């Protein structure tokens, strides 16, 4: 019995190793005779066995539930710009026959490998790009006053960032999927949040033919106005000034507005259906002559400087000549 068990175990190990060899070879060679768009260049292909790739996301470690073929590539665009992207192709058995492209966050410049892995683990062939520029060359993807961000001075890279970055890598990603599985994906989807949400809106407007469905969460949309609002808010509630609004003050203000206007639509559900109909007065949160703004480290009212800052933020910037918002 022991001999039979050992023989069976060795046979299983041999079969597993043989299967890994086949999948390694499939991943390594399937792009060799593949014709992609002339501006697309394959950098490398790597096969990963199940549970061998670890992506750290906050306090969580995410492993690949399935074996997959990773294809890393670039797309050249504009006069001298490059977009990097990766495609994760799960083994045939867990593959659900569908394609999911994922977007970027913030200033982008990196691939969202957490989202890539999550979609892979859900059975999708997934792809992501860096939006056409590198965070490492752009203040590590962080914006700050008086900081030079090279890609923001390159009109082609700014255009790619929101409008075109996803569309640049999706056609080649679909070609890779078709070549690997010998058939096209049955459906193609996009998912993104914040900057990725704005990219989703741009896809629907400028590249609607690429996807069967688009998930655009919390879209950081209308960037000309959004960027101005960041500067405006920082100007009126700057840190280390009397007008500064810490998160506790923002939470206090937001909760007061919610309590005043939540039920206007007939349902008290934690959502203000129409903020423009909410006629809440920030002055109602002002500290009176006997109050201090904090009580046992809890915000209970706003100081005159904070009231002025909150009013400016709610009112927003206006055209200095016309007075229009």
Predicted regions and their residues:
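Classical eukaryotic N-terminal signal peptides for Sec-dependent ER targeting/secretion
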Residues: 1-10
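Alpha/beta-hydrolase fold nucleophile elbow
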Residues: 183-194
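Cap/lid segment of the alpha/beta-hydrolase catalytic domain
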Residues: 96, 106-182, 228
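Short, solvent-exposed loop/turn and secondary-structure capping segments
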Residues: 82-86, 111-116, 131, 137-146, ...
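Catalytic-loop region of hydrolases
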Residues: 11-98, 110-114, 268-271, 281-325
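Glycine-rich His-Gly loop
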Residues: 75-77, 104-107, 219
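Glycine-rich nucleophile elbow surrounding the catalytic serine of serine-hydrolase chemistry
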Residues: 192-202
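A catalytic-pocket lid/entrance helix-loop region that shapes and gates access to the active site
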Residues: 202-204, 209-318
